[in-house]
Amino acid sequence: MAYVINEACISCGACEPECPVNAISSGDDRYVIDADTCIDCGACAGVCPVDAPVQA
């Protein structure tokens, strides 16, 4: 299961550089995770100050 970024995202960008497979990019109102690229490692969740990345 891939991670998704929920509506709690404050677009701080902390998660993007932590992703080892570059699955995270900035979206219109929050960051988004490409489910096909995500390897479910949880690195994004570990650095998010608002716990926005959650397992889908």
From Swiss-Prot:
It comes from the Bacteria. One of its GO terms (cellular component) is cytoplasm. One of its GO terms (molecular function) is metal ion binding. Its cofactor is [4Fe-4S] cluster. Binds 2 [4Fe-4S] clusters. [4Fe-4S] cluster 1 binds at residues 9, 12, 15, 48. Residues 1-28, 29-56 form the 4Fe-4S ferredoxin-type domain. [4Fe-4S] cluster 2 binds at residues 19, 38, 41, 44. Keywords: 4Fe-4S, Electron transport, Iron, Iron-sulfur, Metal-binding, Repeat, Transport. Ferredoxins are iron-sulfur proteins that transfer electrons in a wide variety of metabolic reactions. PANTHER family: PHOTOSYSTEM I IRON-SULFUR CENTER (PTHR24960:SF79), PHOTOSYSTEM I IRON-SULFUR CENTER-RELATED (PTHR24960). This is 4Fe-4S ferredoxin FdxA. It comes from Gottschalkia acidurici (strain ATCC 7906 / DSM 604 / BCRC 14475 / CIP 104303 / KCTC 5404 / NCIMB 10678 / 9a).
